[in-house]
């Protein structure tokens, strides 16, 4: 309008993103729930303190949808530290259990926020309102199958059918504060700063060579690289696109995108 106001304000993306370092989280499996809850609380703080007035559509989406994207990094680094080959059956089993755990605790935290602060706009029309979004977890809980993966989660409370059913009922009764909770951001440079492998992606080289501005050539060895872990740090080309796609397919619990590069 001529006065600078808007007849209609749509909803655009507000990227409130953060990532957990899988290797750090798995040092204390019994505290996975606490780590996820704290991460969601931190991202919620970003949502609540963000107001981009210059772009009304972003401000509108942030206020009404409260989208956050909790991601993960250092999957390849953690698997190598445990003697597990990226894309193997054990690796895919770990990914399945880990990301189901993250989803459970993220949803639980969002439900607690909604209990006191209300649900995101459109919750009543979502699959969470009628329980269909979580129905599969009540029939097929994502639990460890092998002794190897079960040992990695020793001490952690892994939700069973009853836990998922209880959470499903609580969400239907109380709602969800966030419209979106989980993502898998690419975390390129962020991973290097954290001493981690990028996102849930395989490394492009056991020792990566990068050019960093005025620093020139910089060498980044994979985290924890030594004689024992070297065989598990096959680069993305040697690992192959099939293992990469299988890994991303196992992460079926995210609410946002799964960006990846299929190296062929």
Positions of PLM-derived features:
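Generic alpha-helical structural element
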Residues: 6, 25-28, 32, 64, ...
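Alpha-helix initiation and N-capping motif
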Residues: 10, 14, 19, 29, ...
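Structural beta-strand/beta-sheet cores of well-ordered domains, especially the beta-sheet scaffolds
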Residues: 11-18, 66-77, 82, 109, ...
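Internal maturation/activation junctions in enzymes
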Residues: 35-59, 67, 84-187
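Compositionally biased non-globular segments, especially hydrophobic aliphatic-rich helices
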Residues: 136-138, 260-264
């Amino acid at each position: 309008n001529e006065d600078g106001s808007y007849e209609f304000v749509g909803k655009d993306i507000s990227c409130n993103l953060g990532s957990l370092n899988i290797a750090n989280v798995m040092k204390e499996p019994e505290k996975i729930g606490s780590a996820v809850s704290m991460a969601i609380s931190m991202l919620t703080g970003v949502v609540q303190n963000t107001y981009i007035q210059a772009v009304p559509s972003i401000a509108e989406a942030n206020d009404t949808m409260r989208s956050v994207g909790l991601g993960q990094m250092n999957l390849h680094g953690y698997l190598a530290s445990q003697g597990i080959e990226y894309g193997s059956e054990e690796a895919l089993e770990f990914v399945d259990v880990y990301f189901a755990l993250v989803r459970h605790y993220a949803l639980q935290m969002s439900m607690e926020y909604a209990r006191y602060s209300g649900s995101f706009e459109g919750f009543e029309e979502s699959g969470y309102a009628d329980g269909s979004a979580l129905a599969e977890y009540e029939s097929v809980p994502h639990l460890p199958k092998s002794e190897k993966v079960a040992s990695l989660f020793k001490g952690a409370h892994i939700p069973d059918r009853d836990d998922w059913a209880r959470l499903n009922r609580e969400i239907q009764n109380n709602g969800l504060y966030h419209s979106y909770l989980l993502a898998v951001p690419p975390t390129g440079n962020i991973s290097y700063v954290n001493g981690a492998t990028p996102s849930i992606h395989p490394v492009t080289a056991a020792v990566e060579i990068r050019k960093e501005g005025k620093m020139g050539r910089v060498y980044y060895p994979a985290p924890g690289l030594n004689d024992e872990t070297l065989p598990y740090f096959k680069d993305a080309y040697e690992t192959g696109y099939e293992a990469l796609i299988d890994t991303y397919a196992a992460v079926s619990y995210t609410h946002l995108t799964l960006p990846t590069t299929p190296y062929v």
